[in-house]
Amino acid sequence: MNLEGTSGGILQKEFWRNRIQYNQSQKDILQSWFQHDPFPDKAAREQLAKEIGVPESNIQVWFKNYRVKQRKLDYKCFSEKDQTQGHDQSQHLTQEYLPKEARQKQTFITWTQKNRLVQAFERNPFPDIATRKKLAEQTGLQESRIQMWFQKQRSLYLKKSRMEPMNLLVDDPNERPDATVGWHPINLFLPTDSSHYFSCSHSSSGHETLPPVLPSTQAPWDPFRFHVSQGPNVMIMQPTQAVQEGEKSDQPLIIPNHLLTLPILTKDLDTPTPFWLQYQEEHQNHKEHSGSGVPQVKSHSQPEPEHREQQPLNLGQFDISNILQRWDEICQALLAEWDPLKGTH
């Protein structure tokens, strides 16, 4: 580009034509002023022009050139420094201009520092600021970084503690907790102790079992009330649900290990009568006397014969639907006979 055809080229020519050679005293005055103010305004430049006898425009150019010269000298001195010192300084400048989040991400914890922090966390998961400052002096980390580490460690500890109960339920990692806890088969015979089990056979499956029936005298009589006692994480299956699932599958139906407590009014608590034995006897006696299909409630003032043996009851002739139907009839009959004003005693 031709400088002679532009205004910049004309000014440059005039500058070189009117260039002034400064003596040492003038340079000293200008340099001392530059140290005081590198960007003097027009009034200051006019005052300097009167002192050294140089036009104000030349003084403005001198300050501009001297600023460029000082920048080059500073850059040269910075590049000639030692490589290690220069690396440390550049890293310091980089850390200075990086945002706070980026500086925190670049801070890593060594193995020794982590061990010391873990020991402090085991002693106190919630350290105060004095403890964190003491750890910062011992580990060489910032107090804010230590505070952040403790917060993350506490959150990880809470997640781990929530997962531990599920792991304790399973001994074998290949097994599921709900498939291994609280599911046990029930014997198909009636024992002679106070826990009376009953079973039934269905046309589709002969391995279906029902939960045990126990007498209960602690709660007021309620024909629609029953109590279920079970362990943790055990699924409760109702008898109707068990029948439906048993009909759909050919596999043996196993009821969860829980007790279905039914209220049975008996006077002799040492030798209680099995519910289905009592029902069968009452049903037969009622048919002989009245011929009706609704069973009558047996008076619990009459003592049970002591010589009667409790034989295992073969309920093979009963169907599941018949058993459930008889149960509904018994509940209705007991509800009709029950007087809430008299109570159960």
Curated annotation (Swiss-Prot):
InterPro entries given in the database record: HD (IPR001356), Homeobox_CS (IPR017970), Homeobox_regulator (IPR051306), Homeodomain-like_sf (IPR009057)
Compositional bias segments (type: Basic and acidic residues): 301-310
UniProt keyword annotation of Nucleus present: yes
SMART domains in the record: HOX (SM00389)
Record bears the keyword Coiled coil: no
Entry GO terms, CC: nucleoplasm; nucleus
Assigned keywords, A-Z: DNA-binding, Homeobox, Nucleus, Repeat
Subcellular location: Nucleus
Location of the region described as Disordered in the Swiss-Prot/TrEMBL record: 282-314
Alphabetized CDD domains for the sequence: homeodomain (cd00086)
Ranges of the DNA-binding region feature: 15-74, 102-161
Gene Ontology molecular function: DNA-binding transcription factor activity, RNA polymerase II-specific; RNA polymerase II transcription regulatory region sequence-specific DNA binding
Gene Ontology BP term (one): regulation of transcription by RNA polymerase II
Top-rank lineage group of the source organism: Eukaryota
Predominant location category: nucleus
Similarity comment: Belongs to the paired homeobox family.
Protein name: Double homeobox protein B
Organism (species): Homo sapiens (Human)
